[in-house]
Amino acid sequence: MLGAIGVVFGDIGTSPLYALKECFNPEHGVPFSTQTVYGVLSMLFWSMTLVVSIKYVVFVMRADNNGEGGILALTALAMRASSGGARTIRTLMLLGLLGASMFYGDAVITPAISVLSAVEGMEVMTPALQPWVLPLSLIVLVGLFLLQKHGTHVVGRLFGPVMLFWFVLLGLIGLFSVLRSPQILVALNPVHAIEFMFRHAVQAFIVFGSVFLALTGAEALYADMGHFGARPIRYAWFYIAMPCLLLNYFGQGALLLREPSALQNPFFLLMPTWAVAPTIVLATAATVIASQAVISGAFSMTAQAVHLGYAPRMKILYTSDVEIGQIYVPVVNYALLLLVVAVVLAFGKSDNLAAAYGIAVTTTMLLTTGLVTVVMRNAWKWSLPAVALLGTVFLAVDLSFFGANLLKVAAGGWFPLLLGGLIFFLMVTWHTGTQLLKARNVEGGIPLEPFMEGLLSHPPYRVDGTAVYLTPSIEFVPLALLHNLKHNHVLHSRVLFIHFRTQAVPYVEPAKRLVVKTIGDNLYAVAADFGFKETPAVDEIVRMVGERLGIVFEDMETSFFITRATVVPSQLPGMAMWREALFAWMQHNSAKPSDFFRIPANRLVELGSKVEI
């Protein structure tokens, strides 16, 4: 449970730094009064209860894909459970890709707004420190991204204790404030939220977008389920995170009743003067942890997208020999670094960034609701009325937040939408392009087994050693083999044709990983199944095949053959020429097979071919 507190609740746990302050932003036009404080807090309390506690913790977390959560795992589960045709499956896939794409917008905004809001606490100590806020925030953020290549397994042990201390601090300072003004607890009554919405309908709708800031990070409860399990996350939420968060929000509300001038920064003004400086240090540590969780999530999401065929191959490094989930994706890391620095410089203050925050997350939450209803109906076999009732309630809440956040588009919300939309377009282009490439290969493909039978009837010279051909299909002859026979006129004494298949589950049991078929004299067709959270290791597969067949494949006598296709855009049916050119560029710049499949470069033979799509 301590590990879950350190990773899962970092984002939502740092929301008190800015959420309530943003609700009373003067630009929203909310008249300040005791009743509006009650109304805003009541909206916040019931939103957290409905969205986080009921929707995510009770229902969404039940939709685990063999223990894994997250939008892509949910999409794979919904696609597997769907009873619809190809069009329905494609629609579900597109919804999942859109939700995953929007996550990257969140991955840029979260580190920027979290660290900025923590460092801005220095202004509470003295306005003279204001010029240092931006430089110090950038130093913290740049340092965080530069440390990623070393992994987080060492400092990660501190995440749990630091965040536990953070939540205890949130709860205690909030409790002391509530005890001084206990009347704030009347805001627990939903009547105050309803009255606020009726009396100040326009302002309440605008504030709804700011209330949502208190919920950002809720999706992490589901996304990180595979790392910690559902039960520890549920316990940590109900017994630690939620009580401490609510105490702090209500404590800030109580402070506003006593001192309306505290609106400038109610979180830090809740502290005694002597505690502000150490709290800034702790808050910065908490926001770094929250940022780390989002960055690690971006790495994990990218790896899943690559394995599911939604993104080009990328270099994925493993930073820990102990924890399998500790990965580092250099391209994603430096892209996020550049974007985060650009966002901090462009927006300058957490108040300005708050306008950009939320729209991407609400989109992901809305799509999650849609996918979960599919799982409820098709996988859990719930009755249609039950699914319709729950789906309607959740969609009504999600659409309200989505609509309120749409008002922020002009003020900065356009950025995560633009970024998410661009990534979505690239993912769809890549997926469509790979399908076209497979179709072209099948059209001109030569069936493997008849070809090998004919070849062995008049066999070429057999040379010592083992040849491993990585192929997109074990039904057809790999182009690399055709090139090898054409130019070298030899066949190795042992030949493996290996095809990697990604299944719609996170992990595949080792006993079910291989399907090995003998197709001739020391010729074997191998289908190797992997989950979408696993990265294929060719050496390991060759070893497993050897154990299955009772053969020892010596490393230095085994060569790997891969065909690297050069895509040529054409007028053939498919995508527009400019999209085909984009796909060709992405394919050309994808990671080398030796890097992705972890093949020693001195044992790899890469043969090229041109394919028109």
From Swiss-Prot:
Lipid metabolism keyword on record: no
MF terms in GO: potassium ion transmembrane transporter activity; symporter activity
Membrane topology: Multi-pass membrane protein
Alphabetized InterPro entries for the sequence: K+_transporter, K_trans_C, K_trans_N, Kup
Pfam families found in the cross-reference section: K_trans, K_trans_C
Cell compartments where the protein resides: Cell inner membrane
UniProt keyword annotation of Amino-acid biosynthesis present: no
A single cellular component GO annotation: plasma membrane
Catalysed reactions, semicolon-separated: K(+)(in) + H(+)(in) = K(+)(out) + H(+)(out)
Family: Belongs to the HAK/KUP transporter (TC 2.A.72) family.
Name of the protein: Probable potassium transport system protein Kup 1
Gene giving rise to this polypeptide: kup1
